[in-house]
């Protein structure tokens, strides 16, 4: 009988593996290595300024910018190191890719190579770390091409260019009031809470499901002037509340930490929109496909929700570059499908704004 009638992460993985009698232990061991990295990051986040963890990475006092053009925080760099060091040695991986690394990460020659690829955002929402807002780690596991596994060659970027539907597993860790690991191995979604006394992730939320309907949405409204008409229409209808076409009131949220947004939606429903927009022509989408949109999309779909670009299912998108950006909408199924319908409808000659249909602050 598991301790306190709860399964540990290890016990859960063993139980899942029993569904596949011919499976080896490589996959479970890889998940546990990822979990170990998340435990180390949780500890670093918890110490904060006491451990000298806050602020920008100095890179010998010159600062550092990642491949995204973003200033790296100390914890970005430290978290990336935890992920690479704790996953490179086990013999489970053919290679890795990260938000914080320009190129694919090769497994050092002194370590054996395996049949999986690991892609990750080591610290999502790190811009919030200095103000003590919840942050997290996101990861995705793919199968390496068989030819690469058999030859033992170095991985190349194209090896990672697999649609989200090809993911073997995906998950995230949330570093908040408690540390949680949320995981899907393709058989639903489970949540594990870190027991700080035992140092073990314990199964606390089994078979998580996203409610189909919701009255909450999350979007950065400061970008409204750059939104496409279908997104404007959807948000306007939500804001119109009971007096508008939706005939019910909505609440708007925005944390600026996608892991925190995803976790709230997973627990109580909602819809998250970081849509394609015209703010920067070079970046029509903001979130990274391989290590942000795909793993979160996989979790949402496994929990009965939906993930989309607005125009097509997120998990069907064919990646074309390692750090490819994309618009992302996910959450309660009926709301995401509504937004997809709005994108599919012919463009309106004039957008109807239910908030200002009768009177507007901007009328002459």
From Swiss-Prot:
Which chemical reaction does it catalyze? beta-D-fructose 1,6-bisphosphate + H2O = beta-D-fructose 6-phosphate + phosphate
Q: Copy out the cofactor comment.
A: Binds 2 magnesium ions per subunit.
Residues given in the record as Mg(2+) 2 binding sites: 121, 124, 292
Any one GO cellular component localisation term in the record: cytosol
Q: What class of enzyme is it?
A: hydrolase
PROSITE patterns this protein is in?
FBPASE (PS00124)
- What SUPFAM superfamilies is this protein classified in? Carbohydrate phosphatase (SSF56655)
Q: Which residues of the sequence carry a binding annotation for Mg(2+) 1?
A: 99, 121, 123
Protein's name in the database: Fructose-1,6-bisphosphatase class 1 2
């Amino acid at each position: 009988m598991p301790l306190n009638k709860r399964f540990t992460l290890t016990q859960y993985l063993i139980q899942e593996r029993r569904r596949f009698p011919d499976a080896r232990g490589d996959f479970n061991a890889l998940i546990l290595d990822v979990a170990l990295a998340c435990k180390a990051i949780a500890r670093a986040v918890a110490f904060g300024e006491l451990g000298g963890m806050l602020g920008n990475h100095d890179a010998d006092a010159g600062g550092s910018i990642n491949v995204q053009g973003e200033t790296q925080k100390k914890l970005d760099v430290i978290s990336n190191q935890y992920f690479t060091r704790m996953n490179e040695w086990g013999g489970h991986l053919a290679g890795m890719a990260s938000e914080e690394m320009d190129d694919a990460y090769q497994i050092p020659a002194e370590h054996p190579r395996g049949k999986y690829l690991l892609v990750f955002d080591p610290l999502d929402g790190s811009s919030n770390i200095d103000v003590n807002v919840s942050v997290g780690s996101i990861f995705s596991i793919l199968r390496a091409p068989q030819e690469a596994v058999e030859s033992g060659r170095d991985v190349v970027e194209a090896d990672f260019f697999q649609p989200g539907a090809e993911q073997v597993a995906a998950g995230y860790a949330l570093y908040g009031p408690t540390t949680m690991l949320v995981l899907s191995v393709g058989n639903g979604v489970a949540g594990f809470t870190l027991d700080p006394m035992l140092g073990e992730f314990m199964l606390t939320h089994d078979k998580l499901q996203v409610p189909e309907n919701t009255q909450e949405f999350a979007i950065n409204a400061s970008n409204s002037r750059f939104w496409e008409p279908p997104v404007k229409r959807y948000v306007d209808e939500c804001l119109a509340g009971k007096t508008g076409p939706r005939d019910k009131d909505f609440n708007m949220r925005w944390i600026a930490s996608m892991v925190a947004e995803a976790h709230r939606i997973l627990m109580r429903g909602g819809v998250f929109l970081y849509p394609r927009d015209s703010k920067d022509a070079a970046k029509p989408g903001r979130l990274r496909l391989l290590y942000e949109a795909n793993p979160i999309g996989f979790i949402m779909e496994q929990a009965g929700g939906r993930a989309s670009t607005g125009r097509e299912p997120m998990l069907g998108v064919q990646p074309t570059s390692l750090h490819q950006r994309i618009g992302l909408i996910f959450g309660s199924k009926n709301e995401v499908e509504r937004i997809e319908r709005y994108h599919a409808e012919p463009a309106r000659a004039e957008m109807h704004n239910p908030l200002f249909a009768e009177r507007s602050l901007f009328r002459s």
